[in-house]
Amino acid sequence: MERSVTAGKWLAYCRLMRIDKPIGSLLLLWPTLWALWLAGGGAPAPWTLFVFVAGVFLMRAAGCVINDYADRHFDGHVKRTASRPLPSGEVSEQSAKILFVVLVLLAFGLVLTLNKMTIWLSVAGLVLAWVYPFMKRVSHLPQFVLGAAFGWSIPMAYAAVSESLPATCWMMFLAYICWTVAYDTQYAMVDRDDDLKIGVKSTAILFGRFDNIIIGLLQFSMLALLLALGNITGLGIPYTISLLVAAGMFIYQQILTAGRERDACFKAFHNNKYAGMAIFIGVLFGL
């Protein structure tokens, strides 16, 4: 009995960190890998790669914990999130705060092995990660803050590999923000009806009936920025092909979300992990 209770508690912590749902980690991992390879013109040092991959999973977990803590009084009123560990009472608020601190300290401990520029940038990244969940209370644009928070691994990667932040770094960062706003709007479309009832703000609500048009414009902007970046850095035909593959996936997503059905919007959101992977393959073979 005691063992089963303990096992249940651990499973609740895993669910709080979304270990059972790696989609968010993948959406953060792929652009981090784009940046690591492009910053150095090839594979980064093994330790640098380890720090960033581990950091992605740790900070994504920390982000999920602080997000659920911020939403603890709202999630119980939303069909998709009512069974999460905090609103269901499986994990206490105090335990969630402790877990967040532990995850952040582990990630920061890894960053301390890198150069000073990367360490200072990580502090700004932590602030962005902390601010994002609370933006849903005051602004319809929390997805832009999420894009900056998730995309902050890009300047950190450039700093770690080359100790510089060239224009191409910020082009990639801006492209990633466009992509994040697009895919997280798809995600927000799933909860739009519930969010309207409880007063949570999102780009899905702000964009209204123009949601798919604006998502398409954001996806186009992302691809245009990445194409320009590829031309500047001399990436070859494989990279261009990868962008065409990603464009095909974005068209598929538009077809899925045309009816604005919950399951279809969620499927479109998940499809983005393949777009990110395709672009990374293009970077690998284009260098």
Swiss-Prot record:
Domain of life: Bacteria
Keywords: Cell inner membrane, Cell membrane, Magnesium, Membrane, Transferase, Transmembrane, Transmembrane helix, Ubiquinone biosynthesis
EC numbers: 2.5.1.39
Record-annotated membrane-spanning stretches: 23-40, 98-118, 141-161, 163-183, 213-233, 235-255
Catalytic activity: all-trans-octaprenyl diphosphate + 4-hydroxybenzoate = 4-hydroxy-3-(all-trans-octaprenyl)benzoate + diphosphate
One Gene Ontology cellular component: plasma membrane
Cofactor (UniProt): Mg(2+)
Topology in membrane: Multi-pass membrane protein
UniProt main location, coarse: membrane
Any GO BP annotation: ubiquinone biosynthetic process
Any Pfam family matching the protein: UbiA
Ranges in a coiled coil: none
InterPro entries: HB_polyprenyltransferase-like (IPR006370), Prenyltransferase (IPR039653), UbiA_prenyltransferase (IPR000537), UbiA_prenylTrfase_CS (IPR030470), UbiA_sf (IPR044878)
UniProt-listed NCBIfam families: ubiA_proteo
UniProt-listed HAMAP family: UbiA
Protein name in UniProt: 4-hydroxybenzoate octaprenyltransferase
Record gene name: ubiA
